[in-house]
Amino acid sequence: EAIALAMKTDDALRKTLLSRVSMFFYAGAALAQPIWDSLYESQEREIGERVVMSTGLGMTESGPFGIFVTNPHVRAGDLGVPTPGLELKLVDMDGKTEVRYRGPNITPGYWRAPHETAEAFDEEGFFKTGDAVKWIDETDVHLGLKFDGRIAEDFKLATGTFVSVGPLR
């Protein structure tokens, strides 16, 4: 958000940055559509075209991502297609679709934690991400998937404390 605002208001920064960058990549959380739009507007104003902006979906266990955007016309929430060599499994979970991974970049399990490892994988060896997805366009699966929240809304802080976001709504 800060870089989008700075690129709108700081001509020198915008010119310097966009004269050198050929792609933006971000991860960690989705950007809101107004931020995407602001970044695209700054790019088009300065260099007359959009710089490829990419993201994906992953976690430590998928080292680092499992799904990656390759489409040049990305919108907020788009995740993309599986990385080469990765298999996806889409599982209906009470009205949401969980994405699961199996492939060479997926962890074989948790160190000295056989119970947690067994819980993390399904009977076919797919890692259960807990992430919900939808097709970007159901008529063109080549565009890939978009984020649709979490199957389990609880998450763990770096301190080890679990947080339930349900009551925060």
Residue ranges and their predicted role:
Residues 35-38, 113, 167:
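Residues at alpha-helix caps and immediate loop-helix transition turns in enzyme cores, especially N-
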Residues 1-2, 164-169:
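Short, intrinsically disordered, charge-balanced linker/junction segments flanking boundaries
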Residues 62, 107, 165:
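Glycine-rich phosphate/pyrophosphate-binding beta-alpha loops
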Residues 92, 97-157:
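Conserved ATP-binding/catalytic segment of the ANL
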Residues 1-96:
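Conserved adenylate-forming
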